Regions:
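Phosphate- and other anionic-substrate recognition elements at nucleic-acid/protein interfaces
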Residues: 1-179
Length: 179
């Protein structure tokens, strides 16, 4: 049987907070790292995962949908062939992990670090569902098409503005020539 390690990732514009959970106990002191949300931070994550995950067979990363903020991290995960799942923020907001009384309560305190732990625990409790349908970024063609459609929309708006200006100028010139 594979020994799995579950990583919760709280993504923000500038930083990534990662926490891991092995399904047994939470190591509040050593199971968290905060890095920058860029290539230098991803390199630190790679070193940290290799260090903390040396006794594990598989890794599963989970994070909330945050739009563009997690796109580069997702590209990095896919380049390293890590499996990851995307979680709806509403599900995470309602998720309350079952913890022992002596452990810190995750439902009362709101920090990026605790959010990462909460996501890691969610990842462990839902790993079979996530593994059945892991997340993948769409193909590069999708992003190119999306950019082209946005450009087309912008050009259409600009064209309408120019036509309106031309109409206003023609109407103004006609009004003056009649007088």
């Amino acid at each position: 049987m594979d020994k799995e390690l579950f990583f919760g990732v709280d993504v923000s514009k500038k930083t990534l907070d990662l926490a891991y959970y092995d399904g047994e106990a939470i190591d509040w002191k050593n199971a968290h790292i905060q890095v920058s949300n860029d290539d230098a931070g991803f390199k630190k994550i790679g070193s940290w995962v290799a260090k903390v995950g040396k006794d594990f067979d598989t890794f599963l990363f989970c994070m909330e949908y945050t739009g563009l903020y997690n796109q580069n991290f997702r590209l990095w995960l896919e380049s390293k062939e890590y499996i990851y799942g995307m979680v709806e923020p509403r599900k995470m907001h309602r998720f309350e992990p079952d913890l022992d009384d002596d452990q810190r309560s995750l439902d009362r305190i709101k920090t990026d670090e605790l959010d990462a732990f909460r996501i890691a625990i969610y990842c462990e409790q839902n790993h079979k569902k996530i593994l059945r349908n892991p997340s993948k970024l769409p193909s590069p063609v999708y992003f190119k098409l999306k950019r082209l459609l946005a450009e087309r929309k912008q050009n259409t708006k600009q064209s309408v503005l120019y036509k309106q200006q031309l109409h206003d100028i023609c109407a103004y010139d006609t009004d003056l020539s009649v007088e």
